[in-house]
Curated annotation (Swiss-Prot):
One of its GO terms (biological process) is translation. The lineage of its organism: Bacteria, Pseudomonadati, Pseudomonadota, Gammaproteobacteria, Thiotrichales. It comes from Francisella tularensis subsp. holarctica (strain LVS). GO terms for cellular component: cytosolic large ribosomal subunit. Gene3D superfamilies: 3.30.1390.10, Single helix bin. GO terms for molecular function: mRNA binding; structural constituent of ribosome. This is Large ribosomal subunit protein bL12. It comes from the Bacteria. InterPro entries: Ribosomal_bL12, Ribosomal_bL12_C, Ribosomal_bL12_C/ClpS-like, Ribosomal_bL12_oligo, Ribosomal_bL12_oligo_N_sf.
Length: 125
């Protein structure tokens, strides 16, 4: 006997919220889709450029310059990326270097602060 949609719905209804989140993530990975809801935009008046731009949610943390204390910058890059000593040294000396891609705003700000405390110059893109 085949499993019906109703059987699946009942099984999901009995799951905890964490289990449902894990299930959604697994489905996204398996089928290569995103569970983000599609939002329809209402047509507004045809005017000049949009005044309130959508706030960016993902940032790339880019090391622009290591600064005067390369050793501290290398340590900070190693801590942030998990790179080995040679790879981190090459990254710091070969700036610009993308330390982290698609980081959340909070994570990007924290990483930027950590790298700047080590004397590096960092940009969020």
């Amino acid at each position: 006997m085949a499993i019906t949609k109703e059987d699946i719905l009942n099984a999901v209804a009995e799951m905890s919220v964490m289990d449902v989140c894990d299930l959604v993530k697994m489905m996204e990975d398996k089928f290569g889709v995103s569970a983000a809801a599609a939002v329809a935009v209402a047509a507004g008046p045809v005017a000049g450029p949009v005044e309130a731009a959508e706030e960016k949610t993902e940032f790339d943390v880019v090391l622009v310059d290591a600064g005067s204390n390369k050793i501290a910058a290398i340590k900070a890059v190693r801590g942030a990326t998990g790179l080995g000593l040679k790879e981190a040294k090459d990254a710091v000396e070969g700036t610009p270097f993308t330390v982290k891609e698609a980081a959340s705003k909070e994570e990007a700000e924290a990483l930027k602060k950590q790298l700047e405390e080590a004397g590096a110059k960092v940009e969020l893109k």
